[in-house]
Regions:
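Extreme N-terminal leader/targeting segments of oxidoreductases
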Residues: 1-10, 25-31, 211
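Glycine-rich FAD pyrophosphate-binding loop
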Residues: 11, 15, 27-48
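N-terminal Rossmann-fold NAD(P) dinucleotide-binding loop
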Residues: 19-20
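N-terminal FAD cofactor-binding segment of flavoenzymes
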Residues: 39-86
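Short FAD-binding loop at a beta-strand-to-alpha-helix junction that anchors the flavin cofactor
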Residues: 260-277
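Active-site-proximal substrate-binding core of FAD-dependent oxidoreductases
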Residues: 291-301
Length: 301
């Protein structure tokens, strides 16, 4: 355990895009902030498809969000492939082709870049440290250590300990299964809809030398078939060597209300901050993280 102080202005649980962005803007606003994450490195294990719009595409999708170039800083080392086209594949199988500017990320490198931005602003990180529970102003870790803060932010996804203990709404989380596969693939991202992934969708996102391929389903619509059955059928359409197997979930219940309870607030996937059309959450988490960080910094002042 590193030698680190125990009392902070703010503690962020979870160091992904939402958490690191929140911490960055709290620190830029003058707050002392600690980020606690159970992973090391942050960003691993991979749990998503890694696709984000470019900043230009985000300006088109979210015209009212200011200063996107300051917020969404993606270094070249974090970009696996640049995308120019999207194929939407309906049940008929005939793709609809659209222009789309996107980036397929190297997720660990992307999260490391966000950590560097937060640390440069003054945030500190405690990794490989799992939160047991949160009570009032105190965060209790599984190793027995305790940390206190005036504000505690839950940014640890749909299993965030603050969300689970204080927000008790029904959650619709779509389970997903995916692989990383080496090989040659088209340059367009593919989204498949219909019986291939009932209640969800399947994807193929090309990367440098391979692809991220997977799907998510609603189990209530799966007609007795398992997630693995659907995933195996879809993944078998592509030819290549599987180099990684992953799983996760997409929070599709919509934004949680309220986002704040007392000294606690939620951001990112923990708050249901995802695109309602497909559950994508990286850029939306960062937009929400900036707002949360700036509001918390103002409150602390």
């Amino acid at each position: 355990m590193p030698d680190i102080r125990t009392d902070w202005d703010a503690i962020v649980i979870g160091g992904g895009p939402a958490g690191s962005t929140t911490a960055r803007y709290i620190a830029e606003g003058g707050g002392g902030v600690l980020v606690i994450d159970g992973r090391d490195p942050i960003g691993s294990p991979l749990q998503c498809g890694e696709l984000v719009p470019t900043n230009n595409e985000m300006r088109r999708l979210c015209p009212d969000v200011p200063d996107l170039d300051d917020l969404l800083q993606t270094p070249e080392a974090a970009i696996s492939k640049r995308i120019r086209e999207m194929h939407l594949v309906p049940p008929s199988g005939k793709p609809l082709r659209y222009d789309f500017e996107g980036l397929v990320l190297n997720r660990v490198a992307h999260d490391e870049a966000l950590i560097e931005l937060a640390e440069s602003a003054g945030a500190e990180y405690l990794v490989n440290s799992r939160v047991e529970r949160v009570e009032g102003e105190t965060v209790y870790l599984r190793d027995g250590s305790e940390y206190t803060a005036r504000v505690i932010i839950g940014a640890a996804g749909h299993n965030d300990p603050i969300r689970k203990s204080q927000w008790h709404e029904e959650a619709l989380d779509i389970p997903v299964k995916f692989v990383l596969m080496s090989g040659e693939f088209t340059d367009a991202v593919e989204l498949h809809f219909g019986s291939v992934a009932p209640g969800g969708y399947a994807w193929m996102f090309p990367k440098n030398g391979g692809a991220n391929i997977g799907l998510g389903i609603q189990r209530s619509l799966s007609k007795g078939r398992s997630l693995n059955d659907y995933a195996e059928d879809f993944i078998s359409r592509y030819r290549g060597q599987i180099t990684y197997n992953g799983a996760g979930s997409l929070p599709m219940s919509g934004s949680i209300r309220p986002l704040v309870k007392g000294k606690h607030l939620l951001v990112g996937d923990a708050a249901g901050m995802v695109l309602p059309s497909n559950g994508a959450g990286i850029t939306i988490a960062m937009i929400g993280g900036r707002i949360a960080g700036q509001v918390v910094a103002e409150h602390l002042r």
